[in-house]
């Protein structure tokens, strides 16, 4: 399906989309003017605040010493190693959907150039997230294990079910843009979390700390992504009629039920062999409620933070912690002190002033 990088167009043409072969790309309409983005005139200050937050917390996986977790990894039995590897395989697939299709779809409904800039940032970081899992794989797993994990993620029924449901929402040009935002928030704030449980659990037991540090950095990003896109959904929903708003809410809860039914099966597949299934289901129901809250809606499930394994809840905190940059990068970075330049900074004196340039040294 991925041919010469044209993943988006290939999906449109494939049977995954269901009959999209007959679709035609929109006729090209040339523009007569292109305007520069002006960050000094921002119509929605949430765009500016989100941009600043995202750029402030920029990170890369290569700065985190995952190899330091090898001793912990060797202590895990085969069942737990299988769960860790396949959890990250699933997360890689979902982040691939987000980076390649999700943000592209959302950018079709932007209202300002600043919103486009924020979504560009989010799209890049989703690619960083997807690449981060490969860093983990290359450190902890053998080449044969990595190959098996990716073959599994590309074919596993329940994982593919949720990836395809979300991708089809993104790729359908006739789909309501607000529904695409709902799908995005459900993926960001709900569906990822069956995978996030594992590294947070190990972090709470002081295991795989550097792997978990990557996940905490991803969690910190996803927290901002889900909140921002949920806000944009709420802004758009306010422009709809009362009936349209109710229809959207009815659809939203039905879609969540549909996703949760599949997520239950996926969770059993991943966690039954290690005995964590019930705890993970509580965790994902709690995060489904968080997704609804990001969209301005009431919770669906009775589960609250107090019902979640406290070891995992402690790890899910996205508050910033600093580490020495040259030993281990944490989910907060110490930045060098800077000051604004002024005219005197450009007052460079001639080093030869007052000297006879013809004189020998």
Question: What are these regions, as identified by a protein language model?
Answer:
Residues 8, 12, 16-361:
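Non-heme di-metal
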